[in-house]
Swiss-Prot record:
Membrane-traversing stretches: 44-64, 104-124, 140-160, 183-203, 215-235, 244-264
Membrane topology annotation: Multi-pass membrane protein
Organism, as annotated: Cronobacter sakazakii (strain ATCC BAA-894)
Name the record gives this protein: UPF0761 membrane protein ESA_04062
Family matches, as InterPro entries: UPF0761_bac, Virul_fac_BrkB
Family: Belongs to the UPF0761 family.
Amino acid sequence: MLKSVHQKVARRTGPLLAWLKLLWVRIDEDHMTTLAGNLAYVSLLSLVPFVAVIFALFAAFPMFSDVSVQLRHFVFANFMPATGDIIQRYIEQFVANSSKMTAVGALGLIVTSLLLMYAIDSALNTIWRSTRQRPKVYSFAVYWMILTLGPLLAGASLVISSYLLSLRWASGFNTMIDDVLRIFPLLLSWLSFWLLYSVVPTTRVPARDALIGSLVAALLFELGKKGFALYITMFPSYQLIYGVLAVIPILFLWVYWTWCIVLLGAEITVTLGDYRKLRQAAREEAESV
């Protein structure tokens, strides 16, 4: 299917339009928006357990105890635009309640968080069309690595940003440090998406393709945050209709939009490799004739 689309489009248009057409066909065949909806639903069910596990991990590392509060503010300010304060207040209440649970309940939180990892794994491997199965132990190790490395990377990034802020007193460094801090969320998103696209698929992902796809996803994510906040501010229809409950559809809409961006970055990464293979096959076919 992809080969026939590439051949038809490549004859009539340039490489960029042929690649965009190939990308559109992949998005349609993979039902990307449906996958994003499924992940949004699972994410909302797993949100409180996931956050509870993350902050429990921070409590286990004394070196990050001082940045735990900063991390909360950073996450809600940079990853949940608009209504972030309200959502933060509710989630912190839920997490505080979850800390009173027994060992069995804590195990349930961890399992629920790992189920979110499994849903992400399934969605990305659907996009990569990979049917190879990992050993269960290896899959668990990958999920646990994402669950632990993610918070630790975020904590380390906050330590670095705090260090940069402490250097602002040095003359001549103010402008440069301000510029670095301004693009810091973008760099963190880029690194996170690159790790996601490189580690989770069960097939080999070229590093260059993953870097390009993750960069596009990170840029769209940063623009999406500003656009979503602007939409909520300029068109407050959800607040008018739902009142106090407006936070629920707003949160779901933002999570869905975020997963659309994540999966689009994955589709871009895959399509770069597919397009390169199709061009190589077309070149070899032309040489054989």
